[in-house]
Amino acid sequence: MKNKFIFFTLNLLLAVLGAVLFALSHPNYLNLNGFPFFAYIALIPFFLLLKRTKLKFSFLWGAFSGALSYFIFNFWIIFFHPLAIYIIIAKYCILYSVLFFVLKIIDSYFSRYSFIFQTIAWVAFEYLNTLGFLGYSYGIMGYTQWNFPILIRVSSIFGVWGISFLLVFFSACSASFLFEFYKEKDIKNVYQRYKLPMMIWVGTFFAFILYGAFTKIDLSEAQRARIALVQPNRDPWLGNLEVYRNNYEELKNLSEKALKNFPDIELVVWPETAFIPMIRWHYKYTSTYNPNSLLVRELLHFLDNQKVPFLIGNDDGVLDEKFSDNNFDNLEDKRLDYNAALLFIPKKNVSPPEPQTYRKMHLVPFTEHFPYQKLFPRFYEFLKENDTHFWEKGKEANLLEFNNFKIGTPICFEDTFGYISKAFSKKGANIIINLTNDAWANSAVSQYQHLSMAVFRAVENRLPVLRATSSGQTAFIDQNGNIQEMLPPFIKDILVADVTVLTEGHKTVYSYLGDFFGVLCTIVLILNLCFIIINKFIKRSEVK
């Protein structure tokens, strides 16, 4: 009984240690930059735990490890929505229980060199975790290295998945080495078996470093675009006409200050849903004397009298095409709402408002979008009653153009996914501008975790990435993955960035092939599992 308790306690300690190291590897409450070197060893406790546990218990340890890891790592999400933390915990209970079960099957079947296939499985699960309605990119191991541009430039080939593979392989191989050494107590013999894979890992690590060094883009002769990013630091939980007017006045004053101090600014950017109310809807469908309409017309008058374009985040309301413009009965029920980026060019598309438009395509699950209303009507109503704002999904990665520049504008959550910025790049974008509002969490940790993923969007496509945020992290990241300028969090200020632009573009392997490495790992994992299952059936039939 005592031995069982000690055995269980040690397993529990391994699960807790793995969860803590996982969370500390990313931006966290102790260090906003994270402890990136922990990422190389963070998963060792999990892989050791899998070596020690039986297949039938791997589900439970996976559920516990996943829930604890993301509870610590994503603790700030409690402030986003009362349901969010429960959804995250439930998701990673299920995901990690399946992941640990698969990893244990691989460990049992391939034995000594299971760490190779376990690495492939882990990266495959990371990739699959980003897909579909529940897609969520936070927690991918590769993102821990965001502050090492020379290493992560290889993402222009493999995406973030190549960096994840490097980190997970080290943990899996080290755990296997430690476990065998513990069993055999013969360091020389064990070392001989693991010398080759570790030499290959070291060679790969330095190959990535060399690739990063030799592919650094010389930006000294690049064209420059001076762009002002406004960070208003407003409270997103406050919402009435007086608040909207005060927010507008703050945005206007900050913009005028920037334009006065830097008259050669070419574009001013306001963050996600920076201006409320809906510009097009209130201009077209509400009375001229309606307070919302008056505020909209005041904004349009201001924009039309500027000398530069303005890129503005707005809740874009449009009439459903199924209904006629001439029928004004129950208009609110006929409106489709989009989270949008609107580009206004003075004297061209401001009055009446016909801005160039991009509408957010990848919405936050449950709080911005729930596509299963007919299947789960009660749950849908429950979500609506709990402070959710549902938007329609945009359909195209439209580029917004001014002067000689073509900009892609992923909105908030969207820059955590590589495929959206890739779509902009493929269409010919030469600047990526992300509009974000992370102020709802009131957490610098949340904002730095988000920033860590944005850095990869720059190196994947070798495009400059600008982030205009409500409260942080407003920043300019160059094509080499260097954060050139960044405002402190939770202040009202303007970042005026001299953005290096390669007007002819700089297409990468990732720009063409996207997440092929994640797909490849998934295919190999499926083939491995099929091979194991078929082999089991063959052995059973031979026994009979």
Curated annotation (Swiss-Prot):
Membrane protein topology class: Multi-pass membrane protein
GO MF annotation: an example: N-acyltransferase activity
Highest taxon of source: Bacteria
Location in the cell: Cell inner membrane
Catalytic residue list: E272 (proton acceptor), K360, C412 (nucleophile)
Top-level EC class: transferase
Gene Ontology annotations for the cellular component aspect, listed alphabetically: plasma membrane
Keywords annotated in UniProt: Acyltransferase, Cell inner membrane, Cell membrane, Membrane, Transferase, Transmembrane, Transmembrane helix
Catalytic activity, EC: 2.3.1.269
Entries under Gene3D superfamilies matching the protein: Carbon-nitrogen hydrolase (3.60.110.10)
Residue span, CN hydrolase domain: 225-501
Transmembrane domains' residue ranges: 30-50, 57-79, 91-111, 115-135, 157-177, 197-217, 514-534
Annotated family: Belongs to the CN hydrolase family. Apolipoprotein N-acyltransferase subfamily.
Function as written in the Swiss-Prot or TrEMBL entry: Catalyzes the phospholipid dependent N-acylation of the N-terminal cysteine of apolipoprotein, the last step in lipoprotein maturation.
Protein name according to UniProt: Apolipoprotein N-acyltransferase 1
Gene designation: lnt1
